[in-house]
């Protein structure tokens, strides 16, 4: 995952409603109507948040009749965590390896 991709995803996650949606989905697959019951916003607002989460692959979706079902994409969440851990530690991939300390 590139810095640009990680930055985009972190911007998506900076919205408290989206974080709460992900937390609700951590319990398992839910339909839009179940998610909507938890929030005090309209269906179009939920659709806006879900589109952002789905477009950025944080959530997967399937349609069953007239219902939309949503599920966490655990693989991408694991990838995000792994990339943040890389930033948090010195390792072979770290860009700091290309910077010479004190050679200003």
Curated annotation (Swiss-Prot):
Gene3D superfamilies: Winged helix-like DNA-binding domain superfamily/Winged helix DNA-binding domain (1.10.10.10). Residues 1-92 form the HTH arsR-type domain. The keyword Lipid metabolism does not apply. InterPro entries: ArsR-like_HTH (IPR011991), ArsR_HTH (IPR018334), HTH_ArsR_DNA-bd_dom (IPR001845), HTH_MetalResp_TranReg (IPR051081), WH-like_DNA-bd_sf (IPR036388), WH_DNA-bd_sf (IPR036390). Pfam families: HTH_5. It comes from the Bacteria. This is Arsenical resistance operon repressor.
């Amino acid at each position: 995952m590139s810095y640009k991709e990680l930055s985009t995803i972190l911007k998506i996650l900076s919205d408290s409603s989206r974080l709460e949606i992900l937390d609700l989905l951590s319990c398992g697959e839910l339909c839009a109507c179940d998610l909507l019951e938890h929030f005090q916003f309209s269906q179009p607002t939920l659709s806006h948040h879900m589109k952002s989460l789905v477009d950025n692959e944080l959530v997967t979706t399937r349609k069953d009749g007239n219902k939309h079902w949503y599920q966490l994409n655990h693989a991408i969440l694991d990838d995000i965590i792994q990339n943040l851990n890389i930033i948090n530690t010195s390792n072979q991939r770290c860009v700091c390896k290309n910077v010479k300390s004190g050679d200003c």
